[in-house]
């Protein structure tokens, strides 16, 4: 198969796109960027789409992506940005309702995923992802009412999961999960009766396994 020839005009166009993005959002993104921090920039769906139009190899070295505190509701442009080495993703404090795009992104080396303060109602899309190295999962302050998908998630190294302040009624899935490294969970701020559940067998069994279960507050992130 013939390799694609990159014309001078293509390079100029790519540079123009990147310059346009950097100027608009006051960033300094270049080919040496390891931490892609575009937090608190009023970045919206249109801006994220613009960023996805820059050269694919621009993101080869990125290990941390921070898009927190913006106005994003659609993360599908991330699919074509060719991230291969991401260890940390923070998309907290946006307007995200759908995370199906994560199914098509290489998250094999990912260690931290922060989706807190969004509008998620379920986490079903996460079942299809191989989170072989995920350590911390923050789902706090969403609208999640069903967490049964946790039973089918592949997270052999998951140590912390924050479900603080959602709409969860049933935590029976924690009788069936297989997270051998899990050491802390927060269920606080959900729709069940916390006084009743604090002595529930599920909570007791998790604690017997060495897991710190918090039913009254959020938890400190491990990473």
Tell what function each PLM region has.
Residues 36-38, 62-67, 86-91, 110-115, ...:
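Conserved hydrophobic beta-strand positions in leucine-rich repeat
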Residues 2-6, 33, 180-223:
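C-terminal capping region of solenoid repeat domains
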Residues 49-58, 77-83, 100-107, 124-131, ...:
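A structural signal for leucine-rich repeat
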Residues 111-153:
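Eukaryotic tandem repeat interaction scaffolds
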Residues 15, 24-77:
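LRR N-terminal entry segment and analogous cap-like coil->beta motifs
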